[in-house]
Amino acid sequence: MRTFSPKLLLLLLLVLRHHAESGSIVKFLPGFEGPLPFELETGYIGIAKYWANDERVREALQIRKGSIGKWIRCNSNIHYDDDIISSIPYHMNNSINGYRSLIYSGDHDMEVPFLATEAWIRSLNYPIIDDWRPWIINNQIAGYTMTYANKMTYATIKASGHTAEYKPAESFIMFQRWISGQPL
């Protein structure tokens, strides 16, 4: 049985990825005689989960054996226009009853990207009273914020992911300022 270099195989896959339908099985590659000695499914997830867990690939990337577990792709889709319908009535009710609300997004959040959050906030059509501006911690931009007439504040946290744990200090200061009624 002929063995293939993981680096060479990856290079071929990158070059040929536009010639295959997503989710199809590749049985032959140019430059190699006969069928491939393994099943190769095209598509980012189909290839990546096998390639990233291959011991030869890990060795070539100098990943120490046992230092990390099995590589698993956690999110195959990034939805820039997610509509969080269930949140809209909740926030409208807060506004009608005069409650303040804080909505925040990490600007590196790939679970619910900040563009999706901004889209559903815009759909509320609330007047803006403090337009888009940076909020600062120790003379550094920590994110951007906007305040609406209905006592709703929207903020982003720079270089943060989906939850506060990605930027705990910035998240704490943002919440501390908001809960005490200070501008971000």
UniProtKB/Swiss-Prot annotation:
Pfam families, per database record: Peptidase_S10 (PF00450)
Keyword list, A-Z: Glycoprotein, Secreted, Signal
Localization in the cell: Secreted
InterPro entries, sorted: AB_hydrolase_fold (IPR029058), Peptidase_S10 (IPR001563)
Gene Ontology molecular function, alphabetical: serine-type carboxypeptidase activity
Predominant location: secreted
Keyword Endoplasmic reticulum on entry: no
SUPFAM superfamilies referenced in this protein's UniProt entry, alphabetically: alpha/beta-Hydrolases
Family per record: Belongs to the peptidase S10 family.
Name of the protein described by the UniProt record: Putative serine carboxypeptidase-like 52
Protein encoded by which gene: SCPL52
